Amino acid sequence: MKLKIRSHDVELSDDLRAHLERRLNSALGGFGDQVDSVVVRLSGPNGDGKNGDKRCQIVVRLQPSVKVQETDADLFAVVDRLSLRAARGVTHAIERRR
């Protein structure tokens, strides 16, 4: 599984990168070659005035692609929640293909 992490207006620390890799490998690693790649996009505070909320979007490339996203101030917590949601979405997409 190829993992790409893109960050805009958010510091991508080594700890956050390691956390992302660990959580996504744990959640999606079991799907093997059915998952082509995973793209994670992190972006800084949004323009609607919320205090420091950051956006995380995870796109899992397979047929069809699975996309989950959420906004929260704690990126570590968002990654935890979204990795599980992405895994459920991939499971559902694979079951629909059968």
Predicted stretch roles:
Residues 1-98:
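N-terminal, polar/charged subdomain of small-to-medium soluble alpha/beta proteins
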